[in-house]
Regions:
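Non-heme Fe(II)-dependent double-stranded beta-helix
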Residues: 1-30, 36-131, 137-139, 263-273, ...
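Non-heme Fe(II)/2-oxoglutarate
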Residues: 1-13, 61, 174-179, 213-218, ...
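Short, charged/polar surface micro-motifs in flexible loops or helix N-caps
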Residues: 98, 123-125, 154-157, 169, ...
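Active-site region of the double-stranded beta-helix
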Residues: 108-109, 135, 151-161, 166-168
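A generic structural micro-feature
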Residues: 127, 140-142, 232-236
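Glycine-rich phosphate/pyrophosphate-binding beta-alpha loops
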Residues: 134-136, 145, 226-231
Length: 282
C-alpha cells in the first residue's frame, strides 16, 4: 500500500437519530461520515440472529455468495434482500431508527428503502472487498442515495473499511467489479475498470473508520470504498449495509447487468423508484 491511512473523525448523536450539523457537513464534504452509538444492543442482537438464519438458509438463496480461498480457515459470505424473507431484518428496517438517520444525513424529506446487504468475514479469510462505488451497480440517478453501514462486531483498523475522501465529487466513472473474483458482470459500458486506490499514484487521501457494535458509517453512492480481508484470529467482521433513496433520485434504465438484479415493478426511466420491491418509508 502506497497511500498513508488517516482515521475518520467520528461524531456522537445530539439526540436519537439526529446527528450534529458538523457530521452532516462532513458527509457532504468527504462523502462519508462515522457515527457512534447509532443502534442499541437490542437491535444489534436482533441483526446477529437474523444473520445466523441467513447463513443457515443460504443454500436455498440465489442471492447468497460464499467466497473461500484455498488454505484460508474462514470465508467471506454475503447476501441481499434478507428483509423480504427474514423477520429480524424486516423489523430493523421498518421499526428501528435507521431510516430517520439516513433521511437526516441526506437532508431528505422523503425516503425509499432500496435494499439490505449483509457481509460476514470470518476469522482468517483473506478475501478482500475490492475498490468500488455503489452507483456503478445500480439502475439509479440522483445524489440523495446513501449506504448506511452498521457494525455488529468490534472493527479495528485491520478489518475496517477504507474510503477515498471526496471521491463522490469526482466526475469520472468506472465499471463495477464483482466481489467474487471468479465472476463478471455482463454488457458493461466501454469505460475503465476501477483502479486500485491503495497503489494508484496521486494525492488522494484514504481514510479508515474503526467501529464498535452499533456504530454506523453513512456514505454517498459515489464514494470509492474497499475493505481488507479479516486477518483477526478469533473475531468475525459482521456488518449490515442498508441503502436509502431520497428526494432527487429517479430510475435509470441501464442496459448492463445490475446488482442486485431486481428492477422493481412498473418503473419508468426518469420516474420514481417507489414500488413494492423498493417501498416508501417516509
Amino acid at each position: 500500500m502506497n497511500q498513508d491511512l488517516v482515521q475518520l473523525s467520528s461524531y456522537e448523536f445530539e439526540s436519537i437519530s439526529i446527528p450534529p450539523a458538523d457530521a452532516i457537513e462532513a458527509y457532504e464534504r468527504d462523502g462519508v461520515v462515522s457515527l457512534r452509538g447509532a443502534f442499541s444492543e437490542e437491535w444489534i442482537e436482533l441483526l446477529a440472529h437474523g444473520m445466523e438464519i441467513a447463513i443457515s438458509d443460504s443454500l436455498k438463496q440465489d442471492t447468497a455468495f460464499n467466497i473461500s480461498t484455498p488454505g484460508d480457515p474462514g470465508f467471506f459470505f454475503y447476501d441481499t434482500f434478507m428483509w423480504q424473507r427474514i423477520n429480524q431484518f424486516k423489523r430493523f428496517v421498518f421499526e428501528s431508527n435507521v431510516a430517520d438517520i439516513a433521511a437526516n444525513v441526506m437532508r431528505s424529506k422523503g425516503l425509499i428503502f432500496y435494499f439490505d446487504f449483509m457481509l460476514v468475514k470470518e476469522p482468517g479469510t483473506s478475501s478482500k472487498t475490492p475498490w468500488h462505488y455503489d452507483e456503478a451497480y445500480w439502475p439509479i440517478k440522483g445524489n440523495q442515495i446513501c449506504n448506511l453501514w452498521i457494525a455488529l462486531d468490534h472493527i479495528p483498523i485491520e478489518t475496517a473499511l477504507r474510503f477515498v475522501i471526496g471521491s463522490h465529487r469526482w466526475a469520472k466513472s468506472y465499471n463495477p467489479v464483482h466481489f467474487d473474483p471468479d465472476m463478471y458482470y455482463a454488457d458493461l459500458p466501454n469505460i475503465p475498470p476501477m483502479p486500485d486506490w491503495d497503489v494508484e499514484p496521486g494525492d488522494h487521501k484514504i481514510a479508515f473508520a474503526p467501529m464498535d457494535p452499533g456504530d454506523c458509517l453513512v456514505f454517498n453512492r459515489r464514494t470509492f470504498h474497499s475493505a481488507p480481508g479479516n486477518s483477526l484470529k478469533t473475531s468475525s467482521r459482521r456488518a449490515l449495509a442498508t441503502h436509502w433513496i431520497g428526494d432527487d433520485v429517479t430510475y435509470n434504465d441501464k442496459a448492463h447487468e445490475t446488482d442486485p438484479p431486481y428492477r422493481g415493478e412498473g418503473l419508468v426511466h426518469g420516474g420514481s423508484m417507489e414500488c413494492a420491491t423498493f417501498p416508501r418509508v417516509r
